[in-house]
């Protein structure tokens, strides 16, 4: 993969578990299926994995996925953050975490205006992503945020908003920018 602001390629590793054994599995690269293989390496071609099931009507299969920019082993370790197979519990926890941020602002007005505001707040927090512990470029104990999209514009309103709503997150972003400067010179 590559990111929006850079042509530098990077690898995303993943580790997945299901609550139901697959009847068959494999990987694919380009147009070639590779049955019974459980890992694949980046070669610039489109690459993926598949699982096949025979399911009964309305049967649900739960999947947990961990990702990492470091290794498959780190992806497996990151998967441990999801402690349950209960989708509703995971969903409720995610909603609660978002509400901890979104509830910091109270809005008077009609529903349409509230939807616009809360959608914009949600979008503000989609990037940059906290990838602390996932820096493949250098070893650091500092926070790691490396996907500052259009920072030349977001410093005007988004980052002051972060300072008001989530000052510790904003502080970590600044520490990350300083760490990038120390290691890459910009």
Give residue spans per PLM region:
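Short Pro-Gly-centered flexible turn/kink motifs
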Residues: 55-67
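Edge strands and adjacent loops of beta-rich recognition modules
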Residues: 25-45, 92-99
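Helix-terminus loop motifs that line ligand-binding clefts
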Residues: 138, 169-186
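Short strand-edge motifs at loop-to-beta-strand transitions and within beta-strands
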Residues: 47-51
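Short, small-residue-biased leader/transition segments that mark boundaries at the very start
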Residues: 3-6
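Accessory "access/gating" subregions that flank catalytic or transport cores
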Residues: 86-143
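Terminal amphipathic helices with adjacent charged low-complexity linkers/tails
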Residues: 67-79
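Alpha-helical support elements that line or immediately flank enzyme active sites
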Residues: 119-132, 147-171
């Amino acid at each position: 993969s590559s990111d929006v602001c850079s042509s530098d390629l990077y690898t995303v590793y993943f580790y997945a578990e299901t609550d139901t054994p697959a009847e068959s599995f494999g990987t694919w690269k380009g147009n070639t299926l590779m049955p019974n293989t459980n890992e694949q390496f980046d070669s610039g071609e489109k690459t993926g994995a598949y699982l096949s099931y025979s399911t009964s009507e309305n049967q649900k299969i739960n999947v947990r996925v961990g990702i990492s920019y470091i290794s498959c082993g780190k992806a497996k370790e990151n998967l441990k953050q999801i402690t349950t197979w209960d989708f509703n519990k995971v969903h409720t926890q995610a909603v609660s975490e978002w509400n901890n941020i979104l509830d910091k602002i109270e809005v008077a007005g009609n529903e349409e205006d509230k939807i616009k505001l809360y959608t914009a707040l949600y979008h503000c927090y989609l990037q940059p992503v906290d990838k602390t512990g996932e820096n493949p470029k250098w070893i650091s104990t500092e926070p790691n945020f490396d996907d500052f999209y259009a920072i030349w514009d977001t410093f005007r309103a988004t980052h002051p908003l972060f300072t008001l709503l989530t000052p510790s997150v904003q502080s970590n972003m600044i520490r990350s920018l300083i760490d990038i400067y120390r290691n890459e010179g910009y």
